[in-house]
């Protein structure tokens, strides 16, 4: 992404210079650089794009605070004005429905792209700086790192690669042959894109190994034109190269658009408006100026429209969460691999705890745990996994390894210290995978009615291979989604056998709301491809740390008695607590679970403190 950013900045600087203007480039603290620039040009207004990410909103807030505390010879401090370019022409964001189904019924008009503005000449004699080289930028980032950033290197190797290495070292057999189109291979190609591989003259890509379109607006729009015309064939060498990349990036039907153009849209090289407008115009040109009511005429047009509208929807949800009070806890947004992820943080001091929900749920499923655990002296983080709740639901292959990398990066980039990992259902299994692959990230592991199984004397651990889903699995997912919407309240009450009143309207409404989100069917498809074949006891052994299992014994999804028996027989170091509850004990009997969790973490935290005291 760094090299793509530099390509975009170079193009922008050239475009501005062609209008006798310029791009000012600086490396350093945003508050200091902006304050210095404001004083040099005596600015009265500062325009900035409206951001949804917590980190970027924090930067803008710090700049605004710095300006408000500054003194300026020409009078009052400058004002910060936020601008945005939404795809839909809405009047009041607070009135926009968070239900995608209801949102579509309003039939909001699409906003058209704005023409490029004519800028006044820059005649201030400023030192505009130069776009740094990739090596200079990497050096700056390296020098800016704090001790907490040393974990960043953990992100360089995929979960699949680590797992394969662990199996090899322990001499455990596995089906280690991977298909050439798996996500792991795609990741290996795109990791550090542009830093390896031969550069191609007049290529739309940073290197022959890159899958992301590089450069400025003209190159990106040319690449989009080539993408839309994928089925037409071409003698243009650069277009042929892009068509080759489409085949590599199409790991799922329609997935290639985001892989190729997602970074360019995220960097603002082209807007979602422009990409959507050009796509629809091409479709109209193919159909005598009309849009067919029966769907789009080519798979690339459909892929582009679906991806752009999906990105826009989750940007709207994220932005609305920042301007409206939603839920019981403050919502923050983190961008992971380009996807928008919701999370919350409560607490001022104490050990860090990360709560991970189960399939179909979201961070609010810990509604009566977060604040109570924080009040008992903990810093509590809760995340909504990609694919669930109001986090983005991209067109990707979902798996336990995919989500484990999400947890790894969240701990490394956001929490920035080891956590007590607490997970329910599939979230528990994902926590176990993360702890098993990256033990240094977890202080302890707590599983609440976790998915996964115990395999005595495991000698073979299969690695699931990503495979393209069939039309049948998609049809099954659509039918299952319809069934779940109609039965969600009844199903949930079966999961809360001792306190069915906990299945209230807010919980049911949020689950139904998420089921209408674009991408929801894709997530449900993963159910038919899930292969939670890595034994829990293998992951426990790999983790080597303290583990607590809290089991609701009336869980209709699992045979709790048999599960507990297997744990006691084959995982002697695991502590077990049985509760009179169902599949989600943390929400069915939150007070009991909160007490168990806090006692557990207190016990874990006391031992290092005692060891430290003895050392002194």
Locate the predicted segments by residue:
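Catalytic active-site module of serine/aspartate enzymes centered on a nucleophile-bearing elbow/loop
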Residues: 571-616
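Trp/Phe/Arg-rich N-terminal binding region typifying the photolyase-homology
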Residues: 1-154
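Serine-hydrolase catalytic-loop signature spanning alpha/beta hydrolases and amidase-signature enzymes
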Residues: 350, 358-368, 380
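Conserved loop-alpha-helix segment in the C-terminal half of the alpha/beta-hydrolase fold
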Residues: 373, 542-581, 592
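Conserved hydrolase catalytic core segment
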Residues: 414-461
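Active-site loop/oxyanion-hole signature of alpha/beta-hydrolase fold enzymes
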Residues: 330-336, 342-345, 375-422, 438, ...
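Conserved alpha/beta-hydrolase catalytic His-Asp/Glu region
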Residues: 456-461, 480-545
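Glycine/tryptophan-enriched, flexible segments
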Residues: 95-318
